[in-house]
């Protein structure tokens, strides 16, 4: 399983989330997942909404174009981003390495 896949105009990412981090950042590859650190705590969906907002900003899309496909209640998530206008360097490098 690749951490980042392209399916048509969607980008599918398998993420490992680190909540309550000191800052928001895409850390890099962690096993077969992309590790993302976010400052929000994992309480009452705060981490999920913060993750969606952060990813929307990084990929320059509306929040409605980012959805959690799987793993809403855990640290391991599958996220789909519809028609990203920008791809951060960390993610772009993973896509380039796939072939």
Curated annotation (Swiss-Prot):
SMART domains: DUF167 (SM01152)
Pfam families listed in its UniProt record: DUF167
One GO cellular component term: cytoplasm
InterPro entries: DUF167, YggU-like_sf
Gene3D superfamilies the UniProt entry points to: YggU-like
SUPFAM superfamilies the UniProt entry points to: YggU-like (SSF69786)
Disulphide-bonded residues: none
Family recorded in the similarity comment: Belongs to the UPF0235 family.
HAMAP family the record matches: UPF0235 (MF_00634)
PANTHER family, per database record: UPF0235 PROTEIN C15ORF40
Stated name of the protein: UPF0235 protein AHA_3661
């Amino acid at each position: 399983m690749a951490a980042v896949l392209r399916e048509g105009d969607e980008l599918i990412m398998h993420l490992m989330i680190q909540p309550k981090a000191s800052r928001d950042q895409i850390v890099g590859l962690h096993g077969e997942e992309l590790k993302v650190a976010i400052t929000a705590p994992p309480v009452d969906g705060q981490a999920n909404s913060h993750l969606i907002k952060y990813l929307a900003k990084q990929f320059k899309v509306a929040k409605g174009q980012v959805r959690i496909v799987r793993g809403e209640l855990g640290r391991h998530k599958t996220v789909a981003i519809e028609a990203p206008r920008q791809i951060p360097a960390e993610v772009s490098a993973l896509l380039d390495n796939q072939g």
